[in-house]
Amino acid sequence: MIFLLGVLLFLFTAMDITKTTLSTRGGGLLTNAVARSVRACFFFAAGRRGESRLLEYSGQCVLLAVLASWILALWASLFLVLASSPGSVISSNTRMPADLWETLYYAGFTLSTLGVGDYVAAGDGWRVLSSAAAFCGLTFITAAITYIVPVLSAVNLQNQLGLLINSLGRSPQELLINSWNGADFSGFYDNADKLRELLVQHTLNHHAYPVIHCFHNCDAQRSVVPALVILDEAVRMLESLPPQVPQNRLKRRMLRKALDRHIEMLQSHPADPQAVRAEPPADLAPLKAAGIPIDESAYRPCEQAAAARREALGALLVADGWNWRHIYRQAAAPG
């Protein structure tokens, strides 16, 4: 029974490492459970506030916890297999059977390929098993460590996307005001291709490395989740403008599709519905003051039609420690 338990634990851990590090379908069961648990502990300790600096350490701790869980699970699986047969490990000096602590020690240095040599496997079968375990340990631990590199690369792209959106504007109104040249929104559409490219890549990264959701920036003006909500609200305002306002509708539609796919994917991390505050109506006065021909009677029905979408956006904000006041800051003065 102990032998079978060890084999099953090894297979489960091996599948989890393989799925997490070598596929684009996200993390395994163990990885996702550890990531959610550690992230939830940090979120609770931070008081569910996105501004808390404590959350900036959650991503690193999640990665370390996942790596530690893989190593401990592999170690435990080999220990259970060896412990299932007393005498499977013996002292190289006295030839006496190893006790449980010594067997645990042997399992650890076998997986890590340290090869200390003070304890050895007894019998050809256990020697072959120890060699196979050493090869597996070397392979899986190397894969686990190298997994960190693409994850950090994906986090850098996430930060780049958040900074780019916020450089265009710190609120939906400010983004449009900064892009308006008195005749069209060429300032926005000149950056639309770059935004869409980064957003698509960020979505793919989220599918491949869901742990990047745990990496947090405590500055709302640099955090990617508020930035994406700002962009989504700004695109909705552009969609409600009169037809006579010149726009690149193809670029806008492609950006909207990219936003739709990303937000659908993020909704797999739901927030507590009771914690989601009602989304406020957008203040269109700054846009009118800047000379942007937006018609409130045309925009409000669009806003109401998107109520479910805005509720989902509010849930995403709450799940990351933000709310709508971080989206509708004071818009930039026209000029």
Summary of predicted features, one role per range:
Residues 178, 191-194, 213-216, 220-335:
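Soluble C-terminal extramembrane regulatory/interaction domains of multi-pass membrane proteins
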Residues 45-62, 118:
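Cytosolic juxtamembrane amphipathic/interface segments immediately preceding
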Residues 3, 9-17, 67-70, 78, ...:
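Pore domain of cation channels
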Residues 24-49, 93-94, 157-173:
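Membrane-interface amphipathic/juxtamembrane segments adjacent to transmembrane helices
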Residues 57-75, 224-228:
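Transmembrane alpha-helical segments and their cytosolic interface motifs
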Residues 76-92:
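Transmembrane alpha-helix boundary signature
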Residues 158-228:
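Non-transmembrane accessory domains of multi-pass membrane transporters/channels
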Residues 15, 31-42, 101, 105, ...:
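Membrane-interacting alpha-helical segments
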